[in-house]
Amino acid sequence: QRIQHIRDYCEEIRKTIERYGEGFAVFDQDADYQRSIAFSILQIGELSGGLSEEYRKATSSRVQWGPMKGMRNLVAHSYGSMNREIIWETAVNDIPTLKQFCEEQLAES
């Protein structure tokens, strides 16, 4: 169930990028865009923290769970000063890979 929710937030990020437009310049200038992406990343980090230690260890070669939780903390505790470049890079580079992983896991179950 958590993997399904993580996948859903990955899809939300994809849809948000599709809606607002690709490119950091667009993202950097739109606070709503930033908040939407950041919220989904925060939720993904929160959900990943609830996965069993056994599962995280078993899948650690495919997903870096620790940094994901770290991103959650970065977003949650940035108090308006989050690093937009890191958020953007996560959204466009890491989230598609995570989504693919989740889809594979869901197909196997």
Q: Which residues fall in each region the model found?
A:
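Solvent-exposed interaction patches of small proteins and small membrane subunits
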Residues: Q1-S109
